[in-house]
Every structure is written in structure tokens, then in C-alpha cells.
A protein has these predicted regions:
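Histidine-centered metal-chelating micro-motifs
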Residues: 71-74, 92, 111-112, 116-121
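Glycine- and acidic-residue-biased ligand/ion/polar-headgroup-sensing regions
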Residues: 79-92, 96-97
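Short histidine-centered beta-strand/loop micro-motifs
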Residues: 50-55, 72-78, 95, 103-105, ...
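Conserved short histidine dyad/triad with adjacent acidic residue
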Residues: 44-49, 61-78
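Double-stranded beta-helix
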Residues: 2-9, 121-177
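Short acidic-glycine-tyrosine-enriched beta hairpin
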Residues: 97-116
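A short, N-terminal "cap"/entry segment at the start of jelly-roll beta-barrel domains
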Residues: 1-59, 164-177
Length: 177
């Protein structure tokens, strides 16, 4: 492999391109400021606006979430294991159908493996912008995201609807299913 081909496999931190409309909770207050990064593999974004840095299918996906303080990622699940690596900040992870089955606080350098099929969410509880790396198994990133029913209901109240195909429709922008 030549130098140019190898350099095409590098994603530099300063070149990361966020998507602020990646998921069904993009308009829900408290979750509407998060940024999603799809770094390697197709990821699980529900938005056609998501930029994929390296689209190779290599058996797993690497993504990231960037969030300002007090911004949360809504309760969701995946069909494959998900591992989080805290890159920056302080984070509260919570789990269960309503997010009240348990919680843990993590800091920079901590790694957390969340079992398949458990609803989980997370919130930046630090005072600065925080970032997590997420690793999902499988080329299809587990077939997408499975949202807790209350997340889908909250999103609909704020204009976002998720089709059975996994595509996100924004009624505020006049999109119809």
C-alpha cells in the first residue's frame, strides 16, 4: 500500500465533521445540541446529512458523540455490543426502560461496555464540551438504533418521525413520509 492510500485511512481530529440532525431526538430539548460523528463504517445515523469519514466495512463501526454540558443522549439500544471510551469530560451513563435501573459516572480515559439489548443514555455532566468514542460491532452497526418508546413520542411532539426503513423525517421542514 502506498503512502497516499494509507493516508486516506487517517481521520484527524481537526477534520471531524459533525452531524447535528443524526437522530430522532435532534429537536427534543435537552438532546438538541449533540453532535454525532461517523468515523469508520456506516454507523447508525438516521439522517442523510451524516458525513461518513471512512466507509470501509471492516466488521465494526467507530463513531463519536460530542455534547455541551447538560446535553443528553436519549435512551436507546442496539442489537450488538456497544463500547464507550471517554475522550473528554465527565459523563453520566444511565440505563433501563426509563433510565432508572442504574447509573455510573465516567471520566476521561474510562471505558464502558454496555450489553446488547439494554436501553442506555448518557449526559455530559462536566462544565465543558465533552466527547465520547463509541465502538459498535458488525458492519451494519447492529441494524441501527432501537429507541425507548417515550423517546419516539417526545420526538414526534417536536416534529421528527422515524420511518420503519430507519429514515428520519422532519415535519418542521415539510418532509412527509
Amino acid at each position: 500500500m502506498n503512502q497516499t492510500n494509507m493516508e486516506n485511512r487517517i481521520v484527524r481530529y481537526g477534520d471531524l465533521e459533525p452531524c447535528r440532525t443524526a437522530f430522532i431526538d435532534a429537536h427534543t430539548p435537552g438532546s438538541n445540541q449533540k453532535e454525532n460523528f461517523t468515523i469508520i463504517g456506516g454507523g447508525v445515523s438516521e439522517s442523510p446529512d451524516q458525513y461518513v469519514h471512512i466507509s470501509d466495512q471492516i466488521g465494526f463501526n467507530i463513531g463519536a458523540a460530542g455534547q455541551p454540558p447538560r446535553c443528553r443522549n436519549s435512551l436507546h439500544s442496539h442489537r450488538t455490543a456497544e463500547v464507550f471510551f471517554v475522550l473528554k469530560g465527565w459523563w453520566r451513563f444511565f440505563w433501563g426502560r426509563w433510565g432508572d435501573a442504574g447509573e455510573v459516572t465516567l471520566e476521561e480515559g474510562d471505558i464502558f461496555n454496555i450489553p446488547t439489548g439494554i436501553f442506555r443514555g448518557f449526559e455530559n455532566i462536566g462544565s465543558d464540551y465533552g466527547m465520547l468514542m463509541a465502538i459498535l460491532g458488525g458492519n451494519d452497526a447492529g441494524g441501527g438504533v432501537l429507541w425507548a418508546p417515550q423517546v419516539i413520542q417526545d420526538a414526534a411532539e417536536h416534529g421528527l418521525v422515524l420511518a420503519e426503513t430507519g429514515r428520519l423525517y422532519d415535519k418542521k421542514n415539510g418532509e412527509v413520509m
